[in-house]
Amino acid sequence: MRTLLWLGTALLLAAPALQQRSAIEPARRPAFEAALDPLERLRLGNQRFQHGQAAHFNQERDRRLDLARAQHPFALVVGCADSRVPPEIVFDQGLGDLFVVRCAGEALDDLALASIEYAVQELEVRTIVVLGHERCAAVQMALAGGELPGHLRYLGRAIGPHVEEARARLASGSGPIAPELLEAAVVQNVRGVVAEIESSEPLLAELRQRGELRVVGARYDLESGAVEWLPARR
């Protein structure tokens, strides 16, 4: 009798943990979603994430074994290194779904561009998303100006031209950074990085000119979890 009571108590104590585990049990992605346009797959994944309904597709053991042989990501995300904006979680994607290049403020250098070219040339990725986010500290630092210490100066140099364009558009001086200026600079920085990728020669620029490469800008809202897709510049 004591043994039965002990087992019953143990099962009751373990039940919440078991329920939680089953709630996040990974599953294979439905075939219909895998056949969708890459941007639509990202939109659907972000909708699941922001509504607390993440599916955690492609995280199971069989997926890991498949990926040990080869990877075939369906999109590339160039994003900020901010710990609050991990693309795989924000877009509710699994192992091997996204090729990700991250640096503070989405800043590009030769190594970042080489990583992008690798995904495009070797893995045949044809959809690139540049993902910025609201209240980006790297963008704010570039807006503040002044001499930056250590290697931060390289970050300021990469982001600086984009944020200064936003400042010029708003005719804003060098005083305190208003929220609307920071927001405009975040968006302009994304657009600037998109333009850098599109014009990167020879590989990326040639593919885009032939209509074989798509580069899209997006902005992430830290509170709602929603990704806003920026319209293409004409």
Residue ranges and their predicted role:
Residues Q20-A70, L95-G96, G105-L123, A137-R234:
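Divalent-metal-activated hydrolytic enzyme cores
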Residues V90-V100:
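Short helix-loop-beta junction
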Residues V130:
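Conserved functional hotspot residues or short segments at active or partner-binding sites
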